Regions:
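Short, glycine/charged-enriched secondary-structure capping and boundary segments
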Residues: 3-6, 49-52, 108-112
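Short catalytic helix/loop segments, enriched in acidic residues and glycine
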Residues: 2-23, 116-117
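Glycine-rich, flexible loop/turn motifs
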Residues: 1-4, 59-64, 103-104, 112
Length: 118
């Protein structure tokens, strides 16, 4: 039960979305000043998935990156934080959004550590 995007991590999908958004907006990756990405299921995704997505989109490693991790509205909260940065004059171009790959989320079977016995 896997779809066409099953082989892509959340960071891969985030990178695709960031690259497409930058292209559509006519913004070069080097113009981005900050990246804020929400993601709920970060277990097993490696370090700083927001940075991974940014780099996959061609944004330089020198650009700061932050993850927002909460059960609901991580992506929306990332957008809110980006809006605050822009409104406060801290940045002009901030990439913000959410990313997830439910197909690649860890599968956890509670009680499996001790084994399942009758």
């Amino acid at each position: 039960m896997s779809g066409a995007l099953a082989s892509f991590s959340a960071a891969d999908l985030g990178g695709f979305a960031i690259a497409a958004a930058l292209e559509r907006a006519g913004v070069a990756p080097g113009e981005v000043e900050h990246v804020i990405m929400g993601q709920v299921l970060m277990a097993g995704q490696g370090q700083v998935p927001s940075r991974q997505a940014a780099v996959k989109a061609g944004i330089p490693m020198s650009v700061p990156s932050v993850n927002v991790n909460k059960v609901c509205l991580s992506g929306l909260n990332a957008i809110y934080l980006a809006n605050q940065m822009i409104a406060a004059g801290e940045a002009d171009i901030v990439v913000a959004g959410g990313m997830e790959s439910m197909t690649n989320a860890p599968y956890i079977a509670d009680g499996a550590r001790a084994g399942f016995r009758d």
